[in-house]
From Swiss-Prot:
Its EC number is 3.6.1.66. Belongs to the HAM1 NTPase family. It catalyses: XTP + H2O = XMP + diphosphate + H(+); dITP + H2O = dIMP + diphosphate + H(+); ITP + H2O = IMP + diphosphate + H(+). Binds 1 Mg(2+) ion per subunit. This is dITP/XTP pyrophosphatase.
Amino acid sequence: MEHAILVIATRNKGKSREIGKYLEHFPVEVRDLNDFGPIPEVVEDGATFEENAYKKALLTARVLGLPALADDSGLEVAALGGAPGIHSARYAGPDASDAANNEKLLAALSGVEDRAARFCCVLSLAVPSGPALTYEAFCEGTILTAPRGDNGFGYDPLFHYAPAGKTFAEMSLDEKAKVSHRGRALLELQREFDQVLKWLHARTADENLRRGVGHDMCVTGEDPRGTEPKME
């Protein structure tokens, strides 16, 4: 099978390298937005992580004409009705720092006994015509009353993962990757990537035929996991 090109919808080289490590043994060329010129910013106004991830993946795929993978993630706290949720990065305001977001979270949970929380990550892999595959994963934990650890970012210093007895900010990158929400979603993608590549090649063939470009691959619109892809 010929190599496919997959664009990671980020300019964060660390994130693109992390994703690329999961796919390095497959016939796919992983690129990110640094390999291309400027593209429009995505307005993340979706009501769910899935909607926002799909918007980012689809815009990137349509602008570049290549399959694109995007993620959206955040923290959901049970006692706060799932907040900060999709607003995790801007919980304390549009340009809030991690420290400000953490301070607001601690204030919101002041005196609250139920501190159960979970991180959620949704990956969306879209092709230019609209269909996409979606992967979702969670990591359950609790919110501490004070930060611990100097690694990580975001809410990592407050998120305690009981099986490890550590916050995410106390873990090494390798430790965190094995148990985190993003790591679990990427592992799910990795396990199915042979079938995902077949789906991508079939979709490419379909789109080439629509444009009148010859291609010798079979055309199919089936999701390799047995369910219909998400449509725009």
